[in-house]
Structure formats: C-alpha cells, structure tokens
C-alpha cells in the first residue's frame, strides 16, 4: 500500500471543540470532503490497469475520519469520566493519530516505535502510557530519555529493570482477568494473578519504586460486558492490596476490548461497577486528576477505527475450473480469484485478529458498480461459488475458501472490503 489514498473528514462541528490553531490547520489541510463511495470512485478513475506502471494498481484504503470522530463523541457521551488512550498498535495511520491528538486523547504505546511516532507529533509525554509489561532494557532507557513517566509491569524482573534504568517512573501493576469472553485472549501472555500481586508490591516497596495504580485488559473484542465487572472487582482487591503495602493508588486503567456493536452495554456495566467497587473515590471528569480523585483511563483501539476504513483490492488473476457434473454443487468453488493483498499484508487480521471478511464488488467489466450492483436485478442469480486468494506463493495466503461473486467478475476488476480499520494497516 503506497498510502491511504483518500479520506473523508469529521463533521463541520468538529472545529467547535477546543482545538489549537495547529490542530485545526491539520484537519483543514489533510482531509477531503465526500463519501467513502465517492472517494473510491475517484481513485479508480485515476487507475488504468492496462497502462499503469508496476504497482500502479496497488490495493488501497479509504478512511472515513468522520466515523472516528463519531466514535469519539459516543465515548464522551457514555464514559465521560474515563479518558481514552488510543491503542496505537491497532492502526498507526498518521492522520488518525493527528485527529485523536487534536481531540485530546492520550496514547497507549507498546513499543519504542509507537512512542516515537507520538512524540514526533508534538504530543506531551504525559499523554502516553507505555502499556507493555515486558520491555527490552534499551526501550526502558529510551522511555526514560523521552520523559515517558508511566508504564505497566506484571513481574519482578521488570521491577529490577525499571529500578536500574528508569527509577523515577510511575508504575501500574497489570493484573490477570477473565478474558474467555473475548475474540483475542491476552491473559495467556500478560497479567499477574491476584495471588501474585502482594509479592510484586512488596518487591516494588523494597526497591523504592512508585506504584500508582492498577491496569487490566479483558481481551480484544470483548463480547460479554460482564467481563468488565469481574475485572473491576479484581481491581478493587488489588487497590486494597496496595493500601496494605503502603501505597495510595489513584490510577486505574481499564484496558481495551470495546466493540462497536455493544459499546453502550459495556459502558453501562462499567459505570455501574465503578460505583459498586470504587464508591469512596471522587471520579475526575475527563480523566484529569483532582485531590482525592481517581484518574481512570482506557485503551480502546478497534472501537475508533474498525468501521472507518475500507480496503480496495485488484483482481490480478483468475482460474476457472473445467465444467463437470458437480457444477450444481454450490459448496465447491468454480473459480479461484487472486487479488493483490493477502494474509501477509492487511489480511493478516484473518490469522491474528480472527476477523471474518466479505468482499463487495467495486468495479466489474471496468465499470464502477459499488453499491449499485448489490441490488441490481439478476445479480444474485448470476453468482457462482469461488475462493479468494492473496498474491503470494504460500497456500496459507487464503482470504476466503468459499464465497459467492458474480460470474462476470474478471481480471482487472476491483473488490472492496469494508470494516478494515483494525489490525490491518499495522502490517503493511
């Protein structure tokens, strides 16, 4: 992917927010107005697959940044006391990062490269949490040199490392929670069981390190809102353990896992659980710290960008099976389509993020047909079973082992995949 070819901007009233002149200029100069469908058509009009240079017909994204903004407004409406720290690893597209920075979000960074990309935008280090419990020593030293003052840990060796290379850093103990109700489970790799927390806090106290709070992650793509209640119950217990070891925690990171479809249900559970388990704290509006207050952040990623990005791919080859007696069998592919992006690129989300993707026809017989063809008379009757593959020589580079596309779809035509904003661009 050369770049993200086209963007649609936030609504006009985005500039009503308290933005700096630099932020307003960024939004005004880098964005284009119009729908995703219109932008897709505009880009296709500029590509002639018969005459373009090599890579001229590369797959490309179109992003609707208005969707990112609308998701931000949903967050503010449902969870005003929790400031989102966007998970950069989910989608590091610079225009997304600039928009979220202009809206006042913090950033959840898990690597040195992610931290550098945020620092290079002029974002204050105070708006970054280094949310990786197991960091390379060189990365810890680098974080210290960049004044990144907040990070997570879940093991004693990490405490020794931080004591040696970044002793003034404020620490957040990441606890293990039940992530069995999520698409991508993270507990197998990160998170200290509650039984281990006293030992970790005792060692931190011995090393004279400043532990300020607790973090957790219910897993990416959580489909059970009650998972947050359980995690907040465990967090309450960890807070009490902190008090027993001489710490006064004032920071809580409720992680990610927020989904587009059930966000309001999750937010309702989170609000209720916070009142149940942290009734003795005064919540700080917008996540800002107030005297005797609890600063709460979260680490949403896909919530902001999943629906905002569409990916257009070009069909570079097609192989049609010889006619046989099985032609009436709709479960056997009659054709194999090869496109110019696959599981080694943006479609790594199939393998690593368990996403189910479905293509729509963007152009057919060199005519732009997106949306129009979906309900055209006779189109549904002219579909045939087929498979879709990526461009590499690896047989695992399979996008869809079985789907149905129009028989007239041919080499040079284009497909489009909607909802491709999460854990796709980060691989290209």
Task: Map each language-model feature to its residues.
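A charged N-terminal "starter" segment
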Residues: 1-170, 204-206, 210, 244, ...
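Active-site loop/helix belt of alpha/beta enzymes
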Residues: 2-21, 177-324, 405
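Charged (often Lys/Glu-rich) extended helix/loop segments that serve as interaction or gating elements
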Residues: 47-50, 269, 275, 279-428
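Electropositive phosphate-/nucleotide-binding environments in soluble metabolic enzymes
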Residues: 62-69, 94, 109-112, 137, ...
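Short, solvent-exposed polar/charged micro-motifs at secondary-structure junctions
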Residues: 71-73, 94-98, 223-225, 299, ...
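Active-site beta-loop-alpha junctions enriched in small/polar residues
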Residues: 88-93, 110-114, 133-135, 154-158, ...
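Short acidic, glycine/serine/threonine-rich loops at helix termini
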Residues: 97, 119-120, 140-145, 162-165, ...
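Structured core elements
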Residues: 106, 129, 150-152, 172-174, ...
